[in-house]
Curated annotation (Swiss-Prot):
Its cofactor is Mg(2+); Mn(2+). Belongs to the DXR family. GO terms for molecular function: 1-deoxy-D-xylulose-5-phosphate reductoisomerase activity; manganese ion binding; NADPH binding. 1-deoxy-D-xylulose 5-phosphate binds at K130, S156, E157, S182, H205, S218, N223, K224, E227. Catalyzes the NADPH-dependent rearrangement and reduction of 1-deoxy-D-xylulose-5-phosphate (DXP) to 2-C-methyl-D-erythritol 4-phosphate (MEP). Coiled coil: none annotated. It catalyses: 2-C-methyl-D-erythritol 4-phosphate + NADP(+) = 1-deoxy-D-xylulose 5-phosphate + NADPH + H(+). It comes from Xanthomonas axonopodis pv. citri (strain 306). This is 1-deoxy-D-xylulose 5-phosphate reductoisomerase.
Length: 396
């Protein structure tokens, strides 16, 4: 990348925690990187502020009713940035010459169409939208391979595995990969204690600065379950070769064990700017704004098995991976509805796995042979979960 024109980066989900971290890294390297496209869901004022700072060629607001506010706000600031709105325009930008790299950081299944559009267009895809892989992993990886798109994961765990696997020809030599989990803010609590957890407590992650949905997923261990499914698709590994360990310090991000007995691990401070810098500059390394890891000051590294009795979402994700087909899409959709209800105070913390399990067992799985099939399963799962929300027995 050195000596060439700057990489043109589209940041989808620019106002979220991952989007702002990506823009922080991009701004540190104006000779190498340029934020050429920025998108947001409905936070038009925040998007306008980012446009004033980064001056992209294009800005998009997903909520089309806010298009006039975006257009007029850009004009009022004297910016030449072109305004866009809606899902179709987002997909068009993802596949256009406006970018060669896409940071896919839109939360939830809403991020899937633009992620697929970027893959079809052969872009470098920095994948922070884990739902795209969980919902349509086979389709996404197949599409990327056919178009020559490069998928670089941004999750710290998958970035760690990516970096370890790129250290050698690992096509046949991997015995297993080990994803680490912080354990979330409620590690060590039993189900009785978890019943009283509030949304404010659940979004206060002990190590990472994240958005509310992914913070709750971390607290339930669903985040780790989704990452198991992601790892299966990203690295072509069967579920039997993917393990999980709880590591409360969040310094060892993942490990790869090889058949010769060697184990490689990637360590670093818990800051998403590190993995974003890896994805933006790979195979080069650039400064990310994150300091080095001082193991002496950290003192110790602890590991323990996950408690799937207290946190059954991890078990449910394993079940969905084993079932295959549309089961992961059903899992993901049910979880999105359940987490949203919890964050709105409609249900308790323990209702999240109860709702997900109810939907997984109620809805029959099918072969995931097309995007339409997957989206239909997603819609059905949401309907079943929303109906179950009215059932008091699930409101744990």
């Amino acid at each position: 990348m050195a000596g060439s024109s700057p990489r043109q980066v589209a940041v989808f989900g620019a106002t979220g925690s991952i989007g702002t971290s990506a823009l922080d890294v991009i701004a540190r390297h104006p000779e190498r990187l340029r934020a050429s496209v920025l998108s947001a869901g409905s936070k038009v004022d925040e998007l306008l502020a980012l446009c004033a700072t980064h001056r992209p060629a294009h800005a998009l607001i997903a909520d089309a009713t806010l298009y006039p506010a975006l257009r007029d706000g850009l004009r009022a600031r004297g910016l030449a940035t072109q305004a866009h709105a809606g899902a179709e325009a987002l997909d068009a930008l993802a596949s256009s010459d406006a970018c060669d790299t896409v940071v896919a950081a839109i939360v939830g299944a809403a991020g899937l169409p633009s992620t697929l559009a970027a893959a079809r267009a052969g872009k470098r895809l920095l994948l922070a939208n884990k739902e795209s892989l969980v919902l349509a992993g086979e389709l996404l990886t197949r599409t990327a391979a056919a178009a020559g798109a490069e998928i670089i994961p941004i999750d710290s765990e998958h970035s760690a595995i990516f970096q370890c696997l790129r250290s050698c020809d690992a096509s046949r030599g991997v015995r297993r990969v080990i994803l680490t989990a912080s354990g979330g803010p409620f590690r060590g609590r039993d189900r009785a204690a978890l019943a009283a957890v509030t949304p404010a407590q659940a979004v206060a992650h002990p190590k990472w600065s994240m958005g509310p949905k992914i913070s709750v997923d971390s607290a339930t261990l669903m985040n780790k379950g989704l990452e198991v499914i992601e790892a299966h698709h990203l690295f072509g590994l069967p579920g039997e070769q993917i393990d999980v360990l709880v590591h409360p310090q969040s310094l060892v991000h993942s490990l790869v064990e090889f058949v010769d007995g060697s184990t490689l691990a990637q360590l670093g401070l818990p800051d998403m700017r590190t993995t974003l810098a890896v994805g933006l500059a790979w195979p080069e390394r650039v400064e990310s704004g994150v300091g080095g890891l001082d193991l002496l000051s950290q003192g110790r590294l602890d590991f323990e098995a996950p408690d799937t009795a207290a946190f059954p979402c991890l078990r449910l994700a394993w079940d969905a991976l084993r079932a295959g087909g549309t089961a992961p899409a059903i899992l993901n959709a049910a979880n999105e509805v359940a987490v949203s209800a919890f964050l709105q105070g409609q249900v308790g913390f323990l209702a999240i796995p109860a709702l997900v399990e109810h939907t997984l067992t109620t809805l029959q799985r099918h072969n995931a042979d097309s995007l339409d099939t997957l989206l239909f399963a997603d819609a059905q799962a949401r309907q079943i979960t929303e109906r179950a929300l009215a059932h008091h027995a699930l409101h744990a």
